Curated annotation (Swiss-Prot):
Residues 53-193 are annotated as: RNA-binding. It comes from Human coronavirus HKU1 (isolate N5). It comes from the Viruses. The gene is N. Belongs to the betacoronavirus nucleocapsid protein family. Residues 264-382 are annotated as: Dimerization. This is Nucleoprotein.
């Protein structure tokens, strides 16, 4: 008996195409079919925002899961050993084996007429299913990455049935806690639905309002806002063009960086967001017992540090801050610059609790250990490096060995001079007096 991922979804056999983007059906094809039904013989209007480029390699099989999309160029798609198999209700760990298939997507035309190639998207198929159903686990294929759990036997195909897209919806991709996702990729969600983009549904075709339906379809044909998959980049470019902004990253000059830093520092301390233009020390001061988080790299980049987003998942919400913390109000002494201004401090203390089931737990623990009290090790390295300063030498002047000895001697004397008693100082003063021979009477 074959296993069926999320077999409870099979009861929704009448859902049709409700899964939208999670099922790799073409919404453009759906809209074209609806035009053929309601256009009364008229020629379909061209879709001005659709590229004439090829649509990319087709997906001959339907994956059980939503895809993983690349959003940063030059990033490799990979998972650590034993990770990378999506979890699904009804599938035991012994069947958690398969491969990720790279789907090269189409290009589209931006608002300024340029062609932009979408980055690829990856789909998961169980071992023995999908476009490489006949391949054995580990076979070398371009655009294929094999994954399996430690409990799975990869020598035999998985006993998982194929997905019928007409009665079975795709499952949002989720991974077991601690899974490290490929950098530069994000998991596709199920927020967008195709139901809103189907003007020819049965609920609309029924009833006496066929004339209004015809008029709405006529307006629909002339609209270039047809919902199509993979339109996030296209929509963003249209919005930026409407706002008069260039979607290409602008080069930040020193003057711009200075303005950004000034704008951040003008905000109240609790509203500042440190970044690579205004670092942590500039926003909140040096590290110490009361501000003990951040290593040298994170202090320099602030929230632009690649490790910061996973830490932000631990940050409390405003509600948790006020209602889950101990708050105390104190009045501070007025500053000398503004003696007439009353200054108050709202001091807080609380805790953030999490366990090993939190997604990315191992990565979070690693980042926390690297940044908690990192200033202590930094200070120790600074002190150890300053105990034996390297003597400075002038350019073009060759120093003799005697000069190096005198420099080292003066450095040693400087470190031990604080231990001298007043008697020792008087004795040294006597020794420093020039030698004068005794006169002969």
């Amino acid at each position: 008996m074959s296993y069926t991922p999320g077999h409870h979804a099979g009861s929704r056999s009448s859902s049709g195409n409700r899964s939208g983007i999670l099922k790799k059906t073409s919404w453009v094809d759906q809209s074209e079919r609806s035009h053929q039904t309601y256009n009364r013989g008229r020629k379909p209007q061209p879709k001005f925002t659709v590229s004439t480029q090829p649509q990319g390699n087709p997906i001959p099989h339907y994956s059980w899961f939503s895809g993983i999309t690349q959003f940063q160029k030059g990033r490799d798609f990979k998972f650590p050993d034993g990770q990378g198999v999506p979890i699904a209700y009804g599938i035991p760990p012994s069947e958690a084996k398969g491969y990720w298939y790279k789907h090269n997507r189409r290009s589209f035309k931006t608002a300024d007429g340029q062609q932009k190639q979408l980055l690829p998207r990856w789909y998961f198929y169980y071992l023995g299913t999908g476009p490489y159903a006949s391949s054995s686990y580990g076979d070398a294929h371009e655009g294929i990455f094999w994954v399996a759990s430690h409990q799975a036997d990869t020598s035999i195909p998985s006993d998982v049935s194929a997905r019928d897209p007409t009665i079975q919806e795709a499952i949002p991709t989720r991974f077991s806690p601690g899974t490290i996702l490929p950098q530069g990729y994000y998991v596709e969600g199920s927020g967008r639905s195709a139901s809103n983009s189907r003007p020819g549904s049965r609920s609309q075709s029924r009833g006496p309002n066929n004339r209004s339906l015809s008029r709405s379809n006529s307006n629909f044909r002339h609209s270039d806002s047809i919902v199509k998959p993979d339109m996030a980049d296209e929509i963003a470019s249209l919005v930026l063009a409407k706002l008069g902004k260039d979607s290409k990253p602008q080069q930040v000059t020193k003057q711009n960086a200075k303005e950004i830093r000034h704008k951040i520092l003008m905000k109240p301390r609790q509203k500042r967001t440190p970044n690579k233009f205004c670092n942590v020390q500039q926003c909140f001061g040096k590290r110490g017992p009361l501000q003990n988080f951040g290593n040298s790299e994170m202090l320099k980049l602030g929230t632009n540090d690649p490790q910061f987003p996973i830490l932000a998942e631990l940050a409390p919400t405003p509600g948790a801050f006020f209602f889950g913390s101990k708050l105390e109000l104190f009045k501070r002494d007025s500053d000398a610059d503004s003696p007439s201004k009353d200054t108050f401090e709202l001091r807080y203390s609380g805790s953030i609790r999490f366990d090993s089931t939190l997604p990315g737990f191992e990565t979070i623990m690693k980042v926390l250990k690297e940044n908690l009290d990192a200033y202590v090790n930094s200070n120790q390295n600074t002190v150890s490096g300053s105990l034996s300063p390297k003597p400075q030498r002038k350019r073009g002047v060759k120093q003799s060995p005697e000069s190096f000895d005198s420099l080292n001697l003066s450095a040693d004397t400087q470190h031990i001079s604080n231990d001298f008693t007043p008697e020792d100082h008087s004795l040294l003063a006597t020794l420093d007096d020039p030698y004068v021979e005794d006169s002969v009477a």
